Amino acid sequence: MTLSPYLKEVAKRRTFAIISHPDAGKTTITEKVLLFGQAIQTAGTVKGRGSNQHAKSDWMEMEKQRGISITTSVMQFPYHDCLVNLLDTPGHEDFSEDTYRTLTAVDCCLMVIDAAKGVEDRTRKLMEVTRLRDTPILTFMNKLDRDIRDPMELLDEVENELKIGCAPITWPIGCGKLFKGVYHLYKDETYLYQSGKGHTIQEVRIVKGLNNPDLDAAVGEDLAQQLRDELELVKGASNEFDKELFLAGEITPVFFGTALGNFGVDHMLNGLVEWAPAPMPRQTDTRTVEASEDKFTGFVFKIQANMDPKHRDRVAFMRVVSGKYEKGMKLRQVRTAKDVVISDALTFMAGDRSHVEEAYPGDILGLHNHGTIQIGDTFTQGEMMKFTGIPNFAPELFRRIRLKDPLKQKQLLKGLVQLSEEGAVQVFRPISNNDLIVGAVGVLQFDVVVARLKSEYNVEAVYESVNVATARWVECADAKKFEEFKRKNESQLALDGGDNLAYIATSMVNLRLAQERYPDVQFHQTREH
């Protein structure tokens, strides 16, 4: 059976995001991936903060100052005969809910681990989010040009801490100053590393066969023997790669390399295009939508302001789930039941926008938004249904926000509500007083909000500390019991930006007591948009 042109386009799409702890090398890997996809000519190494050559995927002002990627940008590039969409996820010390939500829009994730450190805290958190949908995971052990931990130990740690089996695809030969290259377990080939070639695609020398005397000559007899001994162990102790188990999120293929030295990244990319799934079906509140359907559907997972400092526009990022987008198409925004003509959707190469004539499942479109689109919005060609699984996550950090000029209360509220619809921050208005409490998943979100309130709404605001530990969205099937709960806990209830009722707890103990005292009330950690 030959595939129709539409199905061919769908089959070649791969949409993935990178998850890692800050400084494990995510931005560097992103650059090298783009280099292989010929999307950029030379990789602008991230480190030189003073130089003008900023990494391609870092943009808003604050990012340029701090050398970190705050906004989740989207990059599309060709690789072999696939088209890859890479969604960048903010990775530095401070990230935000955007990072979590971006993971709901991809079909596969690449986990980058600093091989000197192993599994770190942020990696654990992000893996939990991918578990909500059993997303397939590839793993890249990075920084082999430094001294690393024992590779066997690293695999054990991933298996024990992240509860996913490891299937090594390549295996390192030495590390740090002695790093010589990697051996490919399934191709029986050794790829030799040369240092100092990080900015370009290297011509790699390949030695066929594990027992080839050329290998001893190339890496030295000691390392060659050590490799053979280690491989005996590896083959006995680790999982074989199995595509079914990979797609079910039960095992992860593991690649070793150095992103900075641009070595090993292509092995991982080859695995990605060969094994990662083409665009997957998704649930709505009424049925499952398959990527092969001809009617267009998509959902908004993120909204970003000011991608263009010259325009005060906001761009909504939409993941195409099924059907083909064509310029000038009429789509229904399900939440408002209005039909809109979309003639100026964008694709991205971080910061460089270009208008799209067409897009397919797995692609990400940017829609111009003047405050009418919200996170979680579904667009269809008329069918009334809503995609599920795009949550709000309960904030972990809270501040009270106060105006320097009390006459601007109205602008402040407007600004905060718009920023919360965009997912930049969450805002809570306590029922019993006039405070405004801002909740975030990461500290940097607070700085971003104050900066944006000033530049976009001309409001100067400051933060004060507030006695709030966590928030939970509350609901109850029994109206009478709910009224009683609301009456007795008025001082701890607040409305969020979308007017949903939330319980604001001063401590985890306080939350636990409330949950015990009111067993009929449900306290939710996430809320569907």
From Swiss-Prot:
Record-level GO cellular component terms: cytosol
Compartments in which it is found: Cytoplasm
Residues that span the membrane, as ranges: none
Main location: cytoplasm
Superkingdom to which the source organism belongs: Bacteria
Short name of any one Pfam family annotated for the protein: RF3_C
Domain called tr-type G: residue spans: 11-280
GO biological process: regulation of translational termination
InterPro entries xref list: EF-G-like_DII, EFG_III/V, G_TR_CS, P-loop_NTPase, PrfC, RF3_C, RF3_dom_3_sf, RF3_GTP-bd
One Gene Ontology term of the molecular function aspect: translation release factor activity, codon specific
Binding site for GTP: 20-27, 88-92, 142-145
Sorted UniProt keywords: Cytoplasm, GTP-binding, Nucleotide-binding, Protein biosynthesis
Family, similarity comment: Belongs to the TRAFAC class translation factor GTPase superfamily. Classic translation factor GTPase family. PrfC subfamily.
Function text: Increases the formation of ribosomal termination complexes and stimulates activities of RF-1 and RF-2. It binds guanine nucleotides and has strong preference for UGA stop codons. It may interact directly with the ribosome. The stimulation of RF-1 and RF-2 is significantly reduced by GTP and GDP, but not by GMP.
Listed name of the protein: Peptide chain release factor 3
Organism listed in the record: Shigella flexneri
Recorded name of the encoding gene: prfC
